[in-house]
Amino acid sequence: MKKIFDVLNVIKQKLFVKKDKIHSEKYYRRIDFLNKYSLLFHAIIAMAIVFIVEIISRRSFISACKFVDAHTLAFMYNSFLVFVSFSLVYLFRRRAFARVIITGFWTILGIINGCVLSNRVTPFGYTDLKCIPELLAMNNTSYFTAQQATIVVFGLGAFALFLVALFIKGPKYTGKIRYAGISVAFLALLFVAIPVTTNVAQNTNVVASYYSNIAQGYDDYGFVYSFSSTVVDRGMKKPEDYNKQNVEDVEQKVNSQKQTTTVDGKTGPNIICVLLESFCDPDEINFLQVNEDPIPTFHELEKNYSSGYLNVPVVGAGTANTEFEMLTGLSMQYFGTGEYPYKTILKQTDCESIASDLSKIGYATHVVHNNGGNFYSRTNAFSKMGFDTFTSKELMNITEYTPNGSWPTDDILVSETMKTFDATPNQSDFTYIITVGTHGDYPKEPVIENPTYTVSGVEDEGMKNAWTYYVNQLNEADRFIKELTDELSKRDEDTIVVMFGDHLPTMGLQNSDMKSGDIYKTKYITWNNMGLPKEDADLYAYQLLAQTTDTVGIHEGTIMNYHQTQMNSTDEASYQDGLDLLQYDILYGKRYCYNGTDLYPASDLVMGIDKVDITNVSDSSTSDTVYIYGHNFTNWSKVYINDSKVASTYLSAGVLAINKEDISDGDEITVCQVGSSDTIFRKSENTYTYVDPAVEHDSESETDEPTENQ
């Protein structure tokens, strides 16, 4: 032990104890030279950092060289941004320390981007920082592994220790800062130059102000600029023609053409919208061949019911943004680079959606999703959109997972959807279903033994395994579609279902790989039991539900009516300008289209359909265990004693167990459904007062042993 302490003391003396040291004249001349030409060295270092970051992001030295060659001016502009950040060192005496911090900042961001791109197509952006707590809190997913988390923690820890040592023992500028005012003025000039040079670069097409393809944008214009734009370019820009009169003109145009709704919450059909996670028809991929059709139900519905291509705003990731467009009718093209409105504007602003529109005519509105309720801040977002209920995985008795163990299977969503219908027998329902079974990452090692569906046309063995896994999961999604439509066919209720892929899978697909020629095109299909005619159309995600409701006689809401009356206009520019105007007015403007009032306030969202209750509590006769009996417990049911959570074990949907030492006679017991970050989504309908059998009472409590099936 003494030797260990001796070693630690040596390290401490070497790294963290500053000793005066006499340097040679040559050393001081070198320092003076570096200080004199520091701007030149900053420029060189800035270019080196940008090049290294591009190597990391592209995971290829050759690709980084091609970027510099093909987009030289963009490379220089990225370097200029890093160069400006280095000018901050002139405000400090410990300039070497400041340079290391700035270098580390950009390099760490580049490393994070490289790690992100190894698991998805969409690069790392500012909004991802807000998702990190939720990602880290998720279990049974492939967003983060224990190994990755360990590397990140140790890497940051080592860098922090190095910074401490450098701060203590590193060089310090000893010259007189005689021109502090000039330095600050020079620094201010550089930072003021950023928006000016950015505007020039955008106007000359050196870089772009909007990325229709985020991944391609990062490739073409560099990580430093692209990430920086996600930091400063958030929200919507105010349209130049935004004013009350122009908004009223758009509204008047819509009102003169819109139709009258012919149904209500008692006579209208049930509407089901299904987001099929990462769903892609294998027939759409030019190089891929499958031994037999893995999605026969999908193709049968595509043949017999209305269907078409769906233009979505993301590829490989970003489900929430396709979802946002589909539910609200608003377009992501007017937001900042890589933005998630769920994580920004919807944090504080309510937003008209299909749910609030249908609620106005008496519909009950629901969301069913077999993943965490907090992910993408969905619980908040669905409330802001006006939904009545949200059944997330925390409210489901999930027992089955996909072959790689990452995601719950989707079959449970059928019964959960039927619960939403049964809960409102005298109302029509809108139920939005979000699947996860086909979610990436797709393993490059064989996972499924003797797979039913095999692929060819893929040379790389790892990618062949990934495609094999994916097409077999597509078959599971197809089975879900059949089970859902079969179950709906048994019910004597008019129903229309629209199903769509939110984006293509994370498989590195290019436009040339797709029959559509566009990696931003997925497919949608429909089903109904009402005899509606087949009317195929290619749509944008923000038009999908306007089209669906139009076919069943529902013409509600500012945005949905706008699409229904204007989406087939021959003047595409006018159509997009009107959408931009209304979208800004609703989210960021004065809501002239609502006459300045809040027509669609946030709802009091209820988590889940099933009520959780406690029916009995008893002590074990053979161990220090207390059993809690009730209904609708799940793996996310947690026991609270006097409003404080205690360790508990899930035994079945009717039994939970806690340790005897955590409870005392007279304590109040509550069961809560708990999400990430200890968010309580729902509490049991009742509390139960614990009666300790070891304490004398007027009557004795039961001490029956539970069974696993209870």
Predicted regions and their residues:
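Membrane-interface segments at or immediately adjacent to transmembrane helices
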Residues: 194-273
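Alpha-helix initiation and N-capping motif
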Residues: 129-132, 220-224, 247, 295, ...
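Extended, solvent-exposed polar beta/coil surface segments
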Residues: 1-26, 656-659, 694-710
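Transmembrane and membrane-interface helices of multi-pass
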Residues: 2-217, 666-668
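Short, well-ordered coil↔helix boundary/capping segments
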Residues: 99-102, 126-129, 221-226, 468-478, ...
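Solvent-exposed soluble domains appended to multi-pass membrane proteins
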Residues: 259-265, 273-276, 281-710
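Serine-centered coil/turn micro-motif
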Residues: 14-15, 25, 222, 353, ...
